[in-house]
Every structure is written in structure tokens, then in C-alpha cells.
Curated annotation (Swiss-Prot):
Pathway: Amino-acid biosynthesis; L-histidine biosynthesis; L-histidine from 5-phospho-alpha-D-ribose 1-diphosphate: step 2/9; Amino-acid biosynthesis; L-histidine biosynthesis; L-histidine from 5-phospho-alpha-D-ribose 1-diphosphate: step 3/9. Its EC number is 3.5.4.19, 3.6.1.31. NCBIfam families: histidine_hisI, PRK00051.1, PRK02759.1. One of its GO terms (biological process) is L-histidine biosynthetic process. This is Histidine biosynthesis bifunctional protein HisIE. Pfam families: PRA-CH, PRA-PH. It catalyses: 1-(5-phospho-beta-D-ribosyl)-ATP + H2O = 1-(5-phospho-beta-D-ribosyl)-5'-AMP + diphosphate + H(+); 1-(5-phospho-beta-D-ribosyl)-5'-AMP + H2O = 1-(5-phospho-beta-D-ribosyl)-5-[(5-phospho-beta-D-ribosylamino)methylideneamino]imidazole-4-carboxamide. GO terms for cellular component: cytoplasm. Residues 123-211 are annotated as: Phosphoribosyl-ATP pyrophosphohydrolase. In the N-terminal section; belongs to the PRA-CH family. It is an enzyme of class 3 (hydrolase). InterPro entries: His_synth_HisIE (IPR023019), HisE (IPR008179), PRib-ATP_PPHydrolase-like (IPR021130), PRib_AMP_CycHydrolase_dom (IPR002496), PRib_AMP_CycHydrolase_sf (IPR038019).
Length: 211
């Protein structure tokens, strides 16, 4: 989502540039999972470019130039929104990350071991992969071909996998139950993506019911 020029101008005017010596700290947070991904610095030019392009851009203090996150790796940070803290000297930048954020290959710059990532973060990464498959050619993967066949076929697969889960449970085969449950959840995620929804919407509904 690109910010309107007026919104960027409003943020720029509110930032205490003198206090931050021309470089405002920008904390980057995953919009879906709320996980903090990294921190960088923006000067006024980087802030404006971030708003105009919809991709997070920082000012590199070592290279002394603007750099857009993912400009070489492709792991860009797609802007969702930006806001200032109460002191007007720190930005919170909410994003949809495309790929891992850290140059080490991990989801965040505070996560040294990919195996320690939370299950929900991994699930969100899977949803990102499915979103990419949705726009890919039908011959590129099974999932892409499923999207190409439309909602009716995807819904049919969810129904079929639901039956397989029930059969595995009644047979008492726990290993098979796990496998079939994985298939069901995968196809459910595909269906949610097809309908413009995510597992986050389902989780929010569950939270709402259990307040």
C-alpha cells in the first residue's frame, strides 16, 4: 500500500529531526504476525521514497546512501502503514515481508536459528508462498494449477481431505491422521487465499468467540 503524499508529509513534519540528528529509527514489524523483524534508520528522503514506492527504504550510515531492503536479494518489505511514537522520534513501520528479512536467512534480525521460529510465523510464511503461487502460471506447481481450476475445485479438495482426516481418526492410525490433517490444513489455506482471507482471520474469530 502506497502512502498518500499528504500522509508522508504529515509524518515528516511531526518527526523531531533535530533530536534524531536527521536519522529517525524505524522499527519494522510484520503486519500479520506482529513479529519485530529489524530496525533501520530513515532520513527524510528515505521516508518519502518508502511512501511513494510502497517498499521500505532506509538510509545506510555505512554506505551513506539510500538503500531499499531487498534491492539485491529480492526480499523486500512491502509497506502497510507507518506511525510515530509519542515522542515523535521513532517510527513503527508495519510491513508484509517477502522472504526472510535478515541477511542470514532468518525471519528476523533477532532470530539466530530458523528452527526456533514460532509455528505461527512459519504458517504466515506458508501463506506468503501460497499467495505467490496464486499469481504463477498453472503449469508451475500443483498449487498454481489448483488456483487455476477455481474455487469449486479447491472447495472440493478441502471436502475430500476432511473425509480423509475422519477416516484416519476412525482407523486409529495416528501417523496417518497427522499426514491427512496436514493435507487438510494446506488445502484450507489455499481456499482462504482464494477468497482473499488468511488464517489470521480464522484465529481472530476464535479469539472473539472465547472472550
Amino acid at each position: 500500500m502506497s502512502f498518500k503524499t499528504a500522509e508522508v508529509s504529515s509524518l515528516a513534519e511531526r518527526i523531531n529531526w533535530e533530536k534524531v540528528d536527521g536519522l529517525v529509527p524505524a522499527i519494522v514489524q510484520d503486519f500479520q504476525s506482529s513479529q519485530v523483524l529489524m530496525m533501520g534508520y530513515m532520513n527524510q528522503e528515505a521516508l518519502v521514497k518508502t511512501g511513494e514506492t510502497g517498499q521500505v527504504t532506509f538510509f545506510s550510515r555505512t554506505k551513506e546512501r539510500l538503500w531499499t531492503k531487498g534491492e539485491t536479494s529480492g526480499n523486500v518489505l512491502q509497506l502497510v502503514n507507518m506511525s510515530l511514537d509519542c515522542d515523535n522520534d521513532t517510527l513503527l513501520v508495519k510491513v508484509n515481508p517477502i522472504g526472510p528479512t535478515c541477511h542470514t536467512g532468518t525471519t528476523t534480525c533477532w532470530d539466530g536459528d530458523p528452527q526456533e521460529e514460532s509455528q505461527m510465523v512459519w504458517l504466515h510464511q506458508l501463506e506468503q508462498l501460497l499467495a505467490a503461487r496464486k499469481s504463477a502460471g498453472p503449469d508451475s506447481s500443483y498449487t498454481a494449477s489448483l488456483y487455476a481450476r477455481g474455487t469449486k475445485r479447491i472447495s472440493q479438495k478441502v471436502g475430500e481431505e476432511g473425509v480423509e482426516v475422519a477416516l484416519a481418526a476412525t482407523s486409529g492410525d495416528k501417523a496417518e491422521l497427522v499426514c491427512e490433517s496436514a493435507d487438510l490444513i494446506y488445502h484450507l489455506l489455499v481456499l482462504l487465499q482464494d477468497q482473499g482471507l488468511s488464517m489470521n482471520d480464522v484465529i481472530n474469530k476464535l479469539k472473539e468467540r472465547h472472550k
